[in-house]
Amino acid sequence: MTLLNQVKTLFQRETVFCVSLVLAVLSALAVRPDAAYLSYPDYRTLALLFCLMLIVAGFRSLGVFERLGRALLRRAGSLRELSIALVLLCFFCSMVITNDVTLITFVPFTLLVFRMIRREGRVLTLVVLETIAANLGSMATPIGNPQNLYLCSAAGLTMAQFARAVLPYAGLSLVLLLAVLLLQRDEPLGEARPEEEGEAAPLSALAPYLLLLALCLLVVFRVVGFVPVLLCVAAVVLAVNRRLFRSVDYFLLLTFLCFFIFIGNLKRIPALNDLLLSLVGGHELLAGILASQVISNVPAAILLSGFTQNFAALLTAVNLGGL
């Protein structure tokens, strides 16, 4: 494969990263690299993202979420109950493992189940509802998606401030999802059920990841520093399952880094800084929603956060705009 083809493939697979890299390089032409560049990144956010990706990979390696889905399935007595269980599973799991990981985990499981009960004609609607549920559920916690994690870390939002910004929307969305599911035509389930795959992971295998997740939550709310937790997570994963390091989305981390450089440089160009402050300040909700529609919610959160102090409004905007 030629270098040009490799670049083309990289751009197709990691479009947001490539765009962020180009923006960072172009901004560096206007603001020459110096020692101030080291102050651009939010190292706390980068460390937390890295740690959480390792922890979620650990949970997935133990089959935790698939087993949870099978347990709910065994208790479902009708198609409506099954659909509600799967949608709620996506909604609540996305609060911890992000919407992308939730969908990667449960959509294939849903397709398998509906093939086994011979209801393939009903699965598309359910997958759409699962996608909506995962996106809406992920907005309800600081670790549910990268933009929440970044804004909570950068702004130092308290749990109360975070809850006021997003929980009313998350709660309303859950009610609407349930209403749609209850209006669906109900049918009895067949006898087919997915079989259990091996023994459940023992609590001793889950314990390290649960403890590490608790430590990350303490970092989010600035109870403990991020450096000791980063070292702790890395050491535990090295000892327990070093292959998990391959599951980290390093391009996402590099995307954050490139946007930090781009925004840091923009703030050092007085004319652009003043213009963006006037456009964003006082208009965080509209600016966040529009930017999320154009460049997606994570870049929008990073970009706009450099030009406002109303982080709660921006948090609401990038979550709603990313739906």
Residues of each region from the PLM?
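Small-residue-rich segments of transmembrane alpha-helices in multi-pass membrane proteins
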Residues: 20-26, 49-52, 77-88, 130-141, ...
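Interfacial loop-to-helix junctions that mark the boundaries of transmembrane helices
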Residues: 6-13, 35-45, 157-169, 198-203, ...
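Juxtamembrane and boundary regions of transmembrane helices in multi-pass small-molecule transporters
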Residues: 2-5, 128, 160-202
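C-terminal transmembrane helix pair
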Residues: 163-174, 285-323
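Transmembrane helical segments that form the transport core of multi-pass membrane transport proteins
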Residues: 40, 62, 66-69, 211-306
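Hydrophobic mid-bilayer segments of alpha-helices in multi-pass membrane transport proteins
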Residues: 2-30, 42-54, 205-216, 223-238, ...
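Hydrophobic transmembrane alpha-helices that form the pore/transport pathway of multi-pass ion
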Residues: 86-88, 92-139, 150, 302-319
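Membrane-interfacial loop-to-helix junctions in multi-pass transporters
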Residues: 43-45, 74-87, 116-126, 204-207, ...
